[in-house]
């Protein structure tokens, strides 16, 4: 696992650079910390049974990953532990490139920058996430020529009491391919999840979500979803795992 910041309520990795490599984390200079790494994307593999009896397992690979890389590389950086008054600041900058394992006419470069501003108090946390990507979306491994994407979100949580809490998120994603606009779109989303914790074990959640996708070609798409769940966990709070959930979901998409 490497540089995979995730938003919980919409289960989105707004950056993801899992792979093989090396780097340094939390290198401290005057209180500001730096993460730097060079990583390669692992080559995918379809497991097959081989006839060669010299291989005890007789399986080419496990899961969907091989042991080598596929020629897509990333240099990733994160600068954090920055204080701007009551605001915590994180800055991301990543660069993607290809090796000779990729055909010369298919090699591309990509880069992305990200900014996270967060504020924490006794009642909860609020966070703003901004990401700009050139020739990529949420990973500089996966490159598309002349693609520009922007992601912005506001998320947070608030404790009215220890038992009554709410999580919320607003998100925007702009996908703009300058060479092929057939899939160009702007995505708007909103989620709210009020939660009530009856005790350290049982809780009830009601989650409501709405999404609108505005395509350059093909019009708009709207959808909503409502989920009611009864949950069992060891600990009072949405972060405790494992959690056993019993839920019913309803929704509609145009």
How should these model regions be labeled?
Residues 47, 102, 179, 217, ...:
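Generic domain-boundary/flexible-linker signal
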Residues 1-54, 58-92, 245-253:
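Outer membrane beta-barrel
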Residues 24-25, 118-120, 236:
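A general structural signal for short secondary-structure junctions and capping/turn motifs
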Residues 80-215, 222-226:
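Detector for outer-membrane/organellar transmembrane beta-barrel domains
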Residues 42, 97-99, 136, 236, ...:
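Residues that cap or initiate secondary-structure elements
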Residues 35, 169, 205-207, 243-247:
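Outer-envelope exported proteins of Gram-negative bacteria
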Residues 220-254:
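Predominantly the C-terminal beta-signal and adjacent terminal strand-loop region
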């Amino acid at each position: 696992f490497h540089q995979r910041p995730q938003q919980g309520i919409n289960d989105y990795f707004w950056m993801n650079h899992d792979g093989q490599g090396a780097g340094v984390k939390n290198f401290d200079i005057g209180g500001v910390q730096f993460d730097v790494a060079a990583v390669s994307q692992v080559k995918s593999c379809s497991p097959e049974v081989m006839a060669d009896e010299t291989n005890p397992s007789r399986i080419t690979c496990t899961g969907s990953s091989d042991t080598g890389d596929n020629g897509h590389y990333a240099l990733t950086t994160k600068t954090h532990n920055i204080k701007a008054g009551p605001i915590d600041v994180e800055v991301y900058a990543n660069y993607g490139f290809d090796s000779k394992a990729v055909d010369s006419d298919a090699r591309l470069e990509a880069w992305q920058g990200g900014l996270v501003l967060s504020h924490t108090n006794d009642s909860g946390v609020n966070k703003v996430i901004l990401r700009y990507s050139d020739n990529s979306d949420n990973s500089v491994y996966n490159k598309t020529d002349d693609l520009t994407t922007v992601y912005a979100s506001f998320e947070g949580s608030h404790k009215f009491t220890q038992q009554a809490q709410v999580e919320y998120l607003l998100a925007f994603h702009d996908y703009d391919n300058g060479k092929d606009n057939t899939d160009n779109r702007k995505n708007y989303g909103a989620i709210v999840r009020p939660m009530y914790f009856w005790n350290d074990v049982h809780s009830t959640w009601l989650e409501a979500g709405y999404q609108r996708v505005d395509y350059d070609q093909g019009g708009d798409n709207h959808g909503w979803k409502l989920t009611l769940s009864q949950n069992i966990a060891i600990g009072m709070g949405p972060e405790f795992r494992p959690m056993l959930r019993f839920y019913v979901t309803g929704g509609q998409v145009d």
